[in-house]
Amino acid sequence: MADLKLGLQLGYWSSTPPAGFVALAQEAERLGFDSVWTAEAYGSDALTPLAWIGASTNRIRLGTGVCQLSARTPTATAMAAMTLDHLSGGRMILGLGVSGPQVVEGWYGAPFSQPLARTREYIGIIRQVLRREEPVASPGPHYPLPYTGEGAWGLGKPLKSIVHPLRADLPIFMGAEGPKNVALAAEIADGWLPLYYSPFRNDVYSASLSNAKPGFEISQGVVVNITDDIEKGLLPIKNMLALYVGGMGAKQRNFHKELVSRMGFEAEANRIQELYLSGRKQEAALAVPTKLADEISLVGPVARIRERLAAWRETPVTSLLVSARNATELRTLADVVLGA
């Protein structure tokens, strides 16, 4: 039975920066949390808050969960990761993900084509930058270096980073949902950031993870809700699932809906999307199976949560990433999970 590490999941900002997020990260470090994670969508970025947190902490690892590929070129992402790694004393975890077509094409103005090939090429270039063995070059087709296409002056040449990386093996994680993308993470990355994972359905991902190298990490976000009313405690998870399965993505291509279908809830996923897209959002949440919401979260009295943690310890998951609104909640979560 493996020990589980604990991470603090801060996510991305809503309309304004959340009050006290640095103090929360400091408290997480004091409590023995292993990592703190930020994210980005189409508002706040993932890297700047980590720099702010890193300046006020000493040990806790700093992860992006995730940086979107289309937000930056591979070399720009490598520069930011190297810089943060130096400033934090070697605590950076670079989490990367393709996002989805609505954000990539609607916010970044870039095509979403060939996400797997783009990811492989992107990470390959970052590895070149970090190794610093020779000037960085790539034949493309997604990120050709040097660029020689339309509009080029023909003066570009392969370059080697001026800065020497603190760690040539700076860990790179991938956010991935589809079987091929998860298999790619196992092949080329150092860790995986799933969206949903059920400790009772390890077979959903077992084939995709079969080629993971020793030391491969899996950091899974999980909602922890300590309550005596399990049904009521599951409502926020059901609302979240209704949003993602029903509305996060196009009707004809929703990666979250496809994942829930692979987990054994295809008919339910179809119904959730149908209700959500017709404006019946509350009904969509009520259509989320209690079994699904319960499996991917830790809800109930402390004794029940500790009992269900045993199932998580039998999985390949290495870290649970949790959220908290204040230091009191954080201390309770640390006691329940780390003290189990």
Q: Can you describe what each PLM-predicted range is?
A:
Residues 1-340:
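Active-site-adjacent structural elements that line small-molecule/cofactor binding pockets in enzymes
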